[in-house]
Structures are given as structure tokens and as C-alpha cells.
Design a protein with these regions (language model features):
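Helix-loop boundary and gating motifs at the non-cytosolic
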Residues: 25-82, 245-288
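Residue-level signature of mid-helix packing/kink "hotspots" within the transmembrane helices
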Residues: 51, 79-87, 172-173, 293-301
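Transmembrane alpha-helix termini and helix-breaking/packing motifs in multi-pass membrane transporters
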Residues: 59-63, 174-196, 267-271
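Helix-to-loop junctions at the C-terminal end of transmembrane segments
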Residues: 85-98, 183, 298-312
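Cytoplasmic membrane-interface "Motif A"-like loop-to-helix N-cap segments
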Residues: 95-107, 309-321
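C-terminal ends and interior cores of transmembrane alpha-helices
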Residues: 108-121, 321-338
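Intracellular juxtamembrane helix-capping segments at the cytosolic ends
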Residues: 139-152, 357-364
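C-terminal membrane-cytosol helix-exit motif in multi-pass small-molecule transporters
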Residues: 206-226
Length: 364
């Protein structure tokens, strides 16, 4: 399932879930501050880095001669690693008392993973690169969200996270657009093999990944926290409120049916190849994915503001229903061998809407 970004970034256990954690009243905390802005900029740069890979990865696998099924296996294993990391990252941060340092490590691992992918000549390095990147994403996400949560009031969390996810997705729009454009330009140059243009784009994508680390280091402030070396993971999990455990169960059930949206790109490419040819089909599929990210960035802030008024739960239910609809529509597209760009665009729009709900509200 997607971690784009896209992915279940829950707050640090002790700092966010225990009612004893102090929260300033709404009158003393505005939702737009240096921490929210810095976290948003950092996420935008991080998304620029790895979403560029997402949009060209299916084509990269094709020129390397790696079967399409390998993409599903690689993404599935990487998502599993990210999910496990998210579960324990809050515990580790509370035990050590260093949230910001761990977030910086997480952001550093994204460009490191990109380097492995750029060097890959087969599936092992691709898998290693994805594992490193998604481990970093799983490590940083919950802790970054916990920092943002403590920087705003409870009454404005929806708006803060809606803004954060919107800025985050701007990077996810610009990155793939530039990636597709640079890929088209690079193909006109002389390369030793067909993978050369793809490697060139992957190397360029490392730059915003490094800038993300510097932005978080310079802009985001996190109060010092006392380490808790006696904290135990399983006793902490057992002590979580029953309502939160039920929420985690629901999120986990949805996660079992969720899937990486790299597979949407791959599926659209396969469906359109018969009518457009593989190169043009891959370009159109990449643009459809950019459209999905545009839908997400446009919808994120309004969804967060709406959740502040009516509550997050009803909108999360709608978002999960849209996620199920997206999967059903893609299955039907393959069942009927749909090669219609407008119909496939509808699938990507539904995907953008449900990810906007998921990303903006799950952490609040």
C-alpha cells in the first residue's frame, strides 16, 4: 500500500496518546507557524525526490528487463517494512527522547535509497533502494506528525495537516512533471543503454532529497524531551486506550486492501500500450498520476478544514469507501480491457480524493 507519501503516519505513542501531554489552548496557538511551514516544505522536497522515482519506475523496470510482477513484490515488501517501522518509531523516540534526530535520519535515507535505485541493474538493488527509502519514510512520518500536532491547537489540527499535505503534494506534482519532461529530453542524448535516461533522472532526484534534510534541520523546532529508558513496547501497546486500538484495527484492515499507486501507473501503461505504443502509454500513465496528485493537493486543505467543523471520522469513512471504489474500478478496467484515457482518468481522480482524506485526517 502507498506510503506517499500516501501512507498511515500515526503520532508518537507517549507524547500524543497520553492525556497528560500538555496542549496549549486554541487562543494561544495559531495553526500556521514556522514548524508547520518547515514541515510542509520538507515534505514537499521529500515528495519531489521519491515521487519522481514512482512515476518512472515502471518504465525503468521495463528497460532493465525485469518482469512487471516484480514491481508488486518490491512495493509490497517495502510497504510492509514501512508499516512495521511506523509502529515502533514513536516508541523508539519516546525511549530515547530524540524525535527530531530520528526524523532527520528518516529524511536522509530517502536520497540514499534513490542512489541504490539509480545504480540498479536488476531487482536486488531496486528492492534494497525501496526498502531503505520506505524504512526512512516509516521512521520519520509519525514523529514529524507528532511535532506538528504539538505545534498547533486541537481545534486547528485539521487545517494544519490539510495545509501540510497540500504542500507535501505540490512536490509530488512538480517532481513527476519534471521527471517526465527531463526523461523525454534525456532520451535525445547519447547513452550506452536504454536505461541511461532513467538513471539520469534518478540521480537528479537525489538533490531535493538532500535539500529536504537541510530544510527540516533549519526550520523545524521540537522541544527537548526527557528520555524514558524504562519504556517497554508491548506494555505501552497494551496501555493504549481501547478506542485508539479499535481505530488502529480499522486502519489496519483498510491497509490490507490498499495498494501502491505505482501499480496504477503500471496498469494504465499496460492497458494503453495496444493503442498508443509502450513509450507514449508510459508518458500518458505518468501524466494521469500527476493528475491524481493535483486532485490530492487541491482537496487536502478543504478536507482538513471541513474535518475541523464536522469531525474526522465521517470523512475518513468516505475516504476509505473511495479507496475501495478505486480498486474495484481498476479491476473492471482490466476485466473489460479498457483503453479509454478519460475512464482511466476517473480512476486516478478517485485515487487522489481518497489519498487526500487519508493523508490529511488519519494522523489527527
Amino acid at each position: 500500500r502507498p506510503l506517499n507519501d500516501q501512507h498511515h503516519e500515526l503520532p508518537s505513542m507517549q507524547n500524543e496518546l497520553q492525556e497528560a501531554a500538555p496542549e496549549a489552548p486554541a487562543t494561544t496557538k495559531g495553526w500556521f507557524n514556522r514548524t508547520v511551514a518547515g514541515a510542509g516544505l520538507t515534505s514537499a522536497l521529500g515528495d519531489f525526490c521519491y515521487e519522481t522515482t514512482t512515476v518512472i519506475l515502471p518504465g525503468f523496470l521495463a528497460v532493465l528487463g525485469i518482469p512487471a510482477a516484480a514491481l508488486g513484490i518490491i512495493e509490497g515488501i517495502a510497504d510492509a517494512v514501512a508499516s512495521f517501522t511506523k509502529m515502533v518509531s514513536g516508541y523508539i523516540a519516546d525511549k530515547l527522547g530524540h524525535r527530531k534526530s530520528l526524523v532527520l535520519v528518516g529524511y536522509t535515507l530517502t536520497p540514499v535509497g534513490q542512489v541504490f535505485i539509480a545504480l540498479a541493474a536488476g531487482w536486488p538493488l531496486l528492492l534494497l533502494g525501496r526498502l531503505v527509502s520506505w524504512f526512512g519514510k516509516g521512521l520519520r512520518g509519525p514523529l514529524r506528525d507528532a511535532i506538528v500536532i504539538q505545534a498547533v491547537s486541537p481545534q486547528t489540527r485539521g487545517r494544519a495537516f490539510g495545509f501540510h499535505r497540500a504542500v507535501d503534494t505540490i512536490g509530488a506534482v512538480i517532481g513527476p512533471l519534471l521527471g517526465v519532461a527531463v526523461l523525454g529530453w534525456a532520451q535525445s542524448l547519447h547513452w550506452d543503454d536504454a536505461a541511461g535516461p532513467f538513471r539520469f533522472v534518478l540521480w537528479l532526484s537525489v538533490i531535493p532529497g538532500v535539500l529536504a534534510v537541510l530544510a527540516f534541520l533549519a526550520l523545524v523546532k521540537d522541544p527537548e524531551h526527557s528520555p524514558n529508558p524504562g519504556l517497554r513496547l508491548w506494555s505501552t501497546l497494551r496501555g493504549l486506550p481501547g478506542r485508539f486500538k479499535r481505530y488502529l484495527g480499522a486502519v489496519g484492515i483498510f491497509g490490507l486492501g490498499d495498494f501502491s499507486h505505482s501499480l496504477l501507473i503500471l496498469g494504465a501503461t499496460q492497458l494503453l500500450t495496444s493503442s498508443l505504443g509502450v513509450v507514449q502509454a508510459a508518458q500518458v500513465a505518468g501524466l494521469l498520476y500527476v493528475g491524481r496528485n493535483v486532485v490530492q493537493v487541491v482537496a487536502s486543505y478543504p478536507i482538513g478544514a471541513w474535518a475541523d467543523r464536522i469531525g474526522s471520522l465521517p470523512l475518513l469513512v468516505v475516504g476509505y469507501a473511495l479507496g475501495a471504489l478505486t480498486a474495484v474500478l481498476m479491476v473492471l478496467a482490466f476485466w473489460f480491457h479498457t483503453a479509454s484515457v478519460p475512464l482511466l482518468a476517473g480512476v486516478f481522480v478517485a485515487a487522489g480524493l481518497y489519498v487526500a482524506v487519508q493523508e490529511a485526517l488519519e494522523s489527527t
